[in-house]
């Protein structure tokens, strides 16, 4: 009996399979019956965008009755021989000798048919949307980028560490965290006093992590170079195309590293990941360029092969104010840059990716290193055309006295972070790191307008299916 062959392997090595007996399995995208007594079945197994055309003789004694039951959405296994295809759009086809029907799909109720469905509709059937061309392609791109992230850091001597999902620390200081508790939610007071916290599972307030950075610093100051890659959570009531309540972050931390070294690694990571996508996901990117964003491939090539522009926050504000552009959000020194400002810089001014450095001290969290001017911190944002910020990072404050001052300015209690201050008391060194959201990266690489399409199970305000 022939081994099961993936569709992608049949297309990649098509010459090797001509005349050979193979078995392919997957889900039926379409079936077309011709007047010549032949049925054409488009079979997809998820391994690639292309469908394998199965040619089935309607009078074949092995499966003639079975053919009537095969409709869009059915799961089948087909055994037969590979032959050159005379039709347009495919090089090979599978001439069926035997068909096994694993599972049927009633065409009267199966929601995916041969037409373009809106993304809003597909989100309502999240358990079936991976079977569409778009979400299948997104999944393959996401997989390849995730693997490439590990490759990048492993090849450069970073150690992969696992930081906690449940934490008592708020890295961002914004307070928008999901609380973890075993207390009775129906009778919990609005403000829980300390004695009630002590009755909780951990004996103190605990939350889902917003970042693994602080914990990663612990290991960077022992192993030198580390990274963490896992889910993070924000209880931010933002119902936009750029925000999720649950998403995946990659966060490297490097000892003996300043802002310049941080920038170097961040830019190298972006170039590496975009280069991998262009090389290894070409078919899927062609699909996105054709159906989602016509300028996608050109934008990706610009980011992969162009030098990054570097400007200070102060310079960026000056450029924006002098542009004469009518922005929705006013541009003033001390205000955070919005997506429209970031895109204007990369798309209209520099026409390539950019790094903005040295942000106002008041805008950034307590852990960022204060510059000598006392007004700015050694922070950086990496911006790309079409998206805006894709990476944010900084050199970390390694001086204990200034770190305590920063904490007090940001209303962070130093006594709650004694362990973090200890890292500055015992063998402190300059160190730096950054965070990159995987979904923001996948959204950029695929050109999809809404971030909810690039994560398998989007978590947003009012939505937590599955």
Swiss-Prot record:
One of its GO terms (molecular function) is ATP binding. Its EC number is 6.1.1.22. It catalyses: tRNA(Asn) + L-asparagine + ATP = L-asparaginyl-tRNA(Asn) + AMP + diphosphate + H(+). It is found in: Cytoplasm. GO terms for biological process: asparaginyl-tRNA aminoacylation. Keywords: Aminoacyl-tRNA synthetase, ATP-binding, Cytoplasm, Ligase, Nucleotide-binding, Protein biosynthesis. SUPFAM superfamilies: Class II aaRS and biotin synthetases (SSF55681), Nucleic acid-binding proteins (SSF50249). GO terms for cellular component: cytoplasm. Homodimer. Belongs to the class-II aminoacyl-tRNA synthetase family. PANTHER family: ASPARAGINE--TRNA LIGASE, MITOCHONDRIAL-RELATED, ASPARTYL/LYSYL-TRNA SYNTHETASE. This is Asparagine--tRNA ligase. It comes from Syntrophobacter fumaroxidans (strain DSM 10017 / MPOB).
